[in-house]
Amino acid sequence: MKPFSAIREIARQLLRDEFQGDADQEFADDELDLHINKVLVEISNKRPYEVKETVESDGTREIALDAIKDLIGDKVIRVEYPTGNYPPSELKFSIFGNTLTLESKPTSGEYIYLYCHKVHQVTESASTLSPDLEEVLIEGVVASAGTAFLNNTRKQIVPSSMRLYQAWVDRQSINYQISLNQITRPKAWEF
C-alpha cells in the first residue's frame, strides 16, 4: 500500500518534475492531487471499492443514502435484513434519488446491511487499492497531468519539440487506457 504522497511523488518522477536546485516544479502538489482524485473515480467506475455499510433502522421502510459518502454506479447492490442469518437474508428494495425503500418494514433499532459500491480512497495511512490498481492509478495520473501540461504550454513549445511531447503524452494515455480497460472485477462465489 502506497500512501497518497508516495503516489504523487512517483507520478512526479515519471513526469520528470523532481525538485532540482532553484528550479520550480511544473506541477504543484494540489494540481497533481486533482489528477489523482480524477483517476481514482475512473478506476472506481471499473472496479469499485466494495463495502458493507451498517445502518440502524428508524422503524420506516426508507433509508436516506445521503449519509453514505462516495457511493457510485448502482450505489447499493443488495440489502441484508434481518442480519446474522446463514445464508444471508436478502431483502428486495428500490432506489429513487437518494432514498432506498425496503420491501418490508424493519423494527426500529435493528441493523440493516447495505452492500455498496464506493469510490476508492487513498490517504497517508490507508488505501483501498490493490497493488495492481495503484499502478493503474500512477499511469493515469501521469497521462492526465501530461495532457494538462501539454495543453497549457502548447503555444510556448516550438513545433518540432511539440511533436515529441505529443507523442509521449499519447503513449502515456494509450498505456493508461489499456490498463484501465483490463481492469475486471474479481470472480466471487454466489451463495
Where are these regions (language model features)?
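Internal mixed-charge
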Residues: 1-13, 30-34, 38-44, 88-191
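N-terminal interaction modules that seed assembly of large macromolecular complexes
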Residues: 19, 24-62
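Ser/Thr- (and often Asn-) enriched beta-sheet segments in non-cytosolic proteins
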Residues: 52-64, 78-80, 92-94, 99-101, ...
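Surface-exposed ligand/attachment interfaces on beta-rich extracellular proteins
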Residues: 55-69, 123-131
